[in-house]
Amino acid sequence: MNQTPRLSPIRAALLATGVLLSAREVWAQGCVASRCPVNMSPGERLLRSVDGNADHGGEAGIMVTVGYRWLRSDRHFTGTHEEAYRQQEGSEVINNSSYVDVTLAKAITPRFALQLTVPWSEHDRSSVVWDDPDRAKRTRILERFHVQSGGLGDIRLGGTMWVLDPTVHRRGNVLIGLGVDAPTGRKDEKAVHRRLIDNANDIVGDDLRNVDQSIQPGDGGWGIPVDVFAYYSLAKTLSVYASGSYLITPEETNGVITSRSNPFESVMSIADTFAGRVGFDWLVLPKAGLTVSLGMRAEGVPAEDLLGGSDGFRRPGVAVSIEPGISWMKNGWAVQLSVPIAVYRERFKSVADRQWEAASGVPRHGDAAFADYLILGAVTKSF
């Protein structure tokens, strides 16, 4: 008969907190700028792998996690249709983005913990200048230019709580989280862009303006993140997990001017975001604390928010990925790595798209660039 490994109350609260919101980057799928945190790897197996080692760190009730996320987005989609011609003609917009976050968690009781997350991001975005502003008359690309942005993101303070007593219910449990996102990241980062000044003579000049919404460090509004994480042990070395996050943004727009041709996209929208994961994990080497996992992941931006309006410029959409991962935990340390590979991408029609259609009678459905894969990593130390 399989026995559930011992799990101290403090370790349960701490590890669940770190698992649920470790690697709290400003999540993004390229141009679809989702700002939702999702756990890097399933938690029950990590709890088991740590407590399978006698010397797994102190019981001070503190956990520090440093998370990392990298992506390159250059695949353009309108709805579910890929605009393959963009890469063929070399006009694709390319985002190279790196996100680093530091999360400090403190267990208050065996069931409740508080945490503070400070995110940082760095971006490089490149696009092209055509020889004519009229798309129908374009014949060649004059140049490709790059803009950079980065800095402090929107800081989050939140709490998590086990639904069931983790000292009693060790085989399965549900963790819920609630917090607040403060608009500490810059919403109006600017950079020098290149634009066509004289198409008759192919003259290109500089233009200082706000960078694209997808590479702004912050979104300019307050948010209410709601999180849930659940696990259930199917066998001694096999578990199923599920998690979800939704960021509620009551404010509608942030007042930052865009350079969009659609007048209904003249200012940036403050959009809700969502993310979720489900899958299995397998403790392959219990004594070494080594776990492998396989699951599905979805993240994106809805076309309409739960609260408040949804006007302004946003690129709503969703990316669904297969997510293999590996994790190692021992002596109070945890290292996690996963590489989600996209299998489905869709750019939704936005409120601004529909407003354009109603005003002009002309169909409109904007596009968005997505990544083929992501690289996610996190290192955690418990004290």
Task: State what each model feature region is.
Residues Q29-V32, G52-G61, S73-H76, R111, ...:
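Short loop/turn motifs that connect adjacent beta-strands in outer-membrane beta-barrel proteins
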Residues C36-N39, W70-Y99, S214:
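Surface-exposed strand-loop-strand hairpins of Gram-negative outer-membrane beta-barrel proteins
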Residues A60, N96-V100, I141, S149-I155, ...:
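Residues that define the transmembrane beta-barrel architecture of outer-membrane proteins
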Residues V64-W70, L116-W120, I176-A182, A242-Y246, ...:
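Transmembrane beta-barrel strands of outer-membrane/channel proteins
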Residues Y68-W70, K106, V118, M161-V163, ...:
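Residue-level signature of outer-membrane beta-barrel architecture
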Residues F77-R86, L247-F383:
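Outer membrane beta-barrel transmembrane domains
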Residues V102, L157-G159, I176, V226-V228, ...:
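Membrane-embedded beta-strands of outer-membrane beta-barrel proteins
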Residues E122-S269:
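Outer-membrane pore/translocation modules
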